[in-house]
């Protein structure tokens, strides 16, 4: 696509004529984030093992990332048609009957766990809390 500026429409200061071969915003960035896409690949959750140094001191730092989904604090049925997809992560420690939600996409920090083996369940969820993908991380806090 050509963008042309002719000499008859030039601003003050005698700016020369310019022709640019430019890609459209859609060519560079992809489809608008405001339109749902039927052919998006499925969302995926990737969870790293906790960092060994802090675990030895009783502190657990677990990083995660997602593919084909943005982690944002957006909830409800109205967010189901947003593209790229949005969602959040449910996090359950050991056999707790409750979980907490992370919508930041930042490193998860756990402190105050008793010495011994632990597991943390990460569940990638859509805006209406349906689980899309899950990963479990296991580690041991030393005595």
Task: Identify the function of each model-found stretch.
Residues 16-60:
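Short, compositionally biased P/S/T/A/G/V-rich stretches that sit at domain boundaries
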Residues 48-50, 65-81:
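Short amphipathic, basic-aromatic surface patches that mediate peripheral association
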Residues 89-91:
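Short beta-strand elements bearing conserved aromatic residues within extracellular beta-rich modules
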Residues 97-105, 111:
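Short beta-strand segments within Ig-like beta-sandwich modules, predominantly Fibronectin type-III
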Residues 110-117:
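Surface-exposed, short loops/turns at beta-strand junctions within beta-sandwich domains
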Residues 123-127:
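Beta-strand-rich extracellular modules
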Residues 138-142:
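Short beta-strand edge segments in extracellular beta-sheet folds
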